[in-house]
């Protein structure tokens, strides 16, 4: 079985594949620092909960945007699973040609998402990942990554509201029934959710106009992506496991 690990700024997401089938997914907080033993024991416990023996894992691939965590994480995989993981980085075969101004600055998570979207749904495709930051990336019909957009994620905006104001409370991020809010909590929810829906729809519209790709498919992923995807008909597909699928595709290209 293949263990795939996506290290994000907020969460670490793990998936286990048996051939092309996901048999387990897990999400833990990206806590720094953690020792290799903490990671190792945590991973073994998570696998055990789903009835997956650690000895059944024969391959591991990691994509990370948090360099500080990689030594402990890699050491844990080697020590507890007996496997040297494949780490997505420069020189990794992806099948996507990066044509942005500085390819080395593109986060591994973005490339992984693009690989999955292109392999699963074909191009041209516009991928939106509602993570810590919200990223929007464009891949052409022939697999070229030509443009990307980055904005503050929904949770970053929410944290700014309750951390940088004296009286606004911490709230659950949900779409209220109406944008015409009548209390503090629903007014914050309306601003966060409807504001992001509006921004997303405008960006999609402008990208379609400027790229002149009328047949562009729009694919969304990320923890809060379903809230936005369910509220607009401009997103064609919501795939919560897009990044995990991308890691599997990349592993297959590099085995």
UniProtKB/Swiss-Prot annotation:
Family: Belongs to the type III pantothenate kinase family.
Keyword Transferase annotated: yes
Record: residues binding ATP: 6-13, 132
Alphabetical UniProt keywords: ATP-binding, Coenzyme A biosynthesis, Cytoplasm, Kinase, Metal-binding, Nucleotide-binding, Potassium, Transferase
Taxon lineage: Bacteria, Bacillati, Bacillota, Clostridia, Lachnospirales
EC number: 2.7.1.33
Pathway linked to the protein: Cofactor biosynthesis; coenzyme A biosynthesis; CoA from (R)-pantothenate: step 1/5
Cofactor names: NH4(+); K(+)
Organism of derivation: Lachnoclostridium phytofermentans (strain ATCC 700394 / DSM 18823 / ISDg) (Clostridium phytofermentans)
Residue numbers binding substrate: 107-110, 184
Keyword Metal-binding: yes
One GO cellular component, as annotated: cytoplasm
One Pfam family here: Pan_kinase
UniProt function note: Catalyzes the phosphorylation of pantothenate (Pan), the first step in CoA biosynthesis.
Record-annotated active site: 109 (proton acceptor)
Catalytic activity: (R)-pantothenate + ATP = (R)-4'-phosphopantothenate + ADP + H(+)
Listed name of the protein: Type III pantothenate kinase
Subunit structure: Homodimer.
Cofactor binding annotation: A monovalent cation. Ammonium or potassium.
């Amino acid at each position: 079985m293949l263990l795939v690990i996506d290290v994000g700024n907020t969460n670490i997401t793990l998936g286990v594949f048996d051939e092309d089938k996901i048999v387990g997914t897990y999400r833990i907080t990206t806590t720094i620092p953690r020792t290799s033993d903490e990671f190792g024991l945590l991973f073994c416990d998570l696998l055990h909960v789903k009835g997956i023996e650690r000895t059944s894992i024969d391959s591991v691939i990691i994509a990370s945007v948090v360099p500080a965590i990689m030594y402990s994480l890699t050491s844990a995989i080697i020590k507890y699973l007996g496997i040297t993981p494949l780490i997505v980085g420069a020189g990794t075969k992806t099948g996507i040609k990066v044509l942005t101004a500085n390819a080395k600055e593109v986060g591994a998570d973005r490339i992984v998402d693009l690989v999955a979207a292109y392999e699963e749904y074909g191009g041209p495709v516009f991928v939106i990942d509602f993570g810590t930051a919200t990223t929007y990336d464009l891949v052409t019909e022939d697999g070229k990554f030509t443009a990307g957009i980055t904005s503050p994620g929904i949770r970053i905006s929410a944290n700014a509201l309750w951390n940088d104001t004296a009286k606004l409370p911490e709230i659950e991020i949900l779409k209220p029934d109406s944008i015409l809010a009548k209390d503090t909590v629903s007014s914050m929810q309306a601003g966060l959710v409807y504001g992001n829906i509006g921004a997303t729809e405008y960006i999609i519209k402008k990208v379609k106009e400027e790229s002149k790709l009328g047949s562009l498919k729009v694919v969304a992923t990320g923890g809060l992506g379903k809230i936005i995807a369910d509220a607009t008909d401009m997103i064609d597909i919501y795939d919560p496991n897009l990044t995990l699928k991308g890691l599997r595709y990349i592993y297959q290209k590099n085995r």
